[in-house]
Amino acid sequence: MKYLIDTHTHTIASGHAYNTIDEMTRKAAQIGLPAIAFTEHTPKMPGSCGKLYFSNFKVLPREKFGVHRLFGCEANIMDYDGTLDMPDTLLEKMDGGDLSYL
């Protein structure tokens, strides 16, 4: 099977991974992965990124080392109403994301 994209990855910014965005992009290029999505944990996850981190995605190149890069988050569902721990104003600027129940 040939993989086209890894849609759920974390970097050192999430607090429990060991590689940078560029290191992971370079590895994706080495193994022939055409695309990778960075879905860092949102602020309610202890040790993770603050909101400022996510607002800065706009300055990152969407392609590097021949790999298409998507930037998003792994947001937490905070209650039974579906409230997320990331404001819509930031979610709208992201390429995508995942949801978890905290």
Where do the PLM segments sit?
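Hydrophobic "anchor" residues on beta-strands that sit immediately upstream
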Residues: 2-4, 36, 70
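Divalent metal-coordination and catalytic microenvironments
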Residues: 8, 28, 40, 69, ...
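Active-site environment of divalent metal-dependent phosphoester hydrolases
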Residues: 12-14, 42-47, 77-79
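Glycine-rich anion/phosphate-binding loops
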Residues: 16-20
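Alpha-helical scaffold segments that flank or form the walls of functional sites
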Residues: 22-36, 56-63
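Extended substrate/RNA-proximal surfaces in nucleic-acid metabolism proteins
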Residues: 48-102
